[in-house]
Regions:
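A short alpha-helix capping/helix-coil boundary motif
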Residues: 1-2, 21, 39-40
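Major-groove DNA-recognition helix of helix-turn-helix-type DNA-binding domains
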Residues: 28-85
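Polyanion-binding surface elements
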Residues: 11-34
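Short recognition helix of helix-turn-helix/winged-helix DNA-binding domains
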Residues: 3-7, 77, 86
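Short helix->loop/beta-hairpin flanking segments within DNA-binding domains
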Residues: 1-16, 47-50
Length: 86
């Protein structure tokens, strides 16, 4: 199991146009097999919507939609971490 990211690092990932398998492994703090299954699940949903997918990646916008992520929430958490020196 890999170490999970700080909110500051999560914000940096969410500002990228695409997330790779390695990015998702860091995000979830899980291994390649688990992340691969999660990515296949998201790809299947995207294909059903008529979208094209690229193996081993997902657009950050699609990832945020699937996970219900609000970028502003992570930015606020990152600011708090910075103030607390975490």
């Amino acid at each position: 199991m890999t170490q999970q990211l700080s909110n500051t690092n999560r914000v940096a990932l969410l500002l990228q146009p695409y997330l790779t398998t390695q990015d998702l492994m860091a995000w979830y703090g899980r291994g390649k097999s688990w992340v691969g299954a999660k990515l296949r699940e998201m790809h299947t949903a995207l294909i059903k919507e008529g979208k094209k997918v690229l193996r081993g990646t997902i657009s950050t916008a699609a990832f945020m939609r699937f996970e219900g992520i609000d970028l502003d929430e992570y930015v606020a958490k990152a600011k708090i971490e910075k103030e607390l020196g975490i």
